[in-house]
């Protein structure tokens, strides 16, 4: 496994996969995505099957179209896309199995060898309730990009071969 110093931000697909895993641990809480549309296209190195470092969680990341990923995690389906803000690789992840279809926000890091993906969800306690639309959320994330409380615990996945 590459040390964290050699990890680079790459491939939202992995971010999406991570987002899905994080969603299983914390519910989707936001009415709107970070950005109203994707900020980049699907990246092939993010597609595939991922397994958590402890071997207990499995995630499948597939391409729906040029910009959207579909993630299958623990029996649930999620729709995800890149929502980069302030040079940070965010993804907007929508729970498509629930009636309210709310979003979660996740930051991802892909190792240089593209075999390891690290995900961190945005801490829902940090974003004020009045940040109700995509442009307000994106501005808030940009202004708070260096806030150490912005992101929650990291989860690591390894690509299945």
Where are these regions (language model features)?
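Hydrophobic membrane-insertion alpha-helices, especially the h-region
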Residues: 15-21
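Short, intrinsically disordered, charge-biased short linear motifs at domain edges
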Residues: 13-15, 36-37
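Calycin-type beta-barrel ligand-binding domains and close structural analogs
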Residues: 29-45, 53-161
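N-terminal secretory signal peptides that target proteins for export/translocation
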Residues: 1-10
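C-terminal motif of bacterial Sec signal peptides marking the signal peptidase cleavage site
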Residues: 24-27
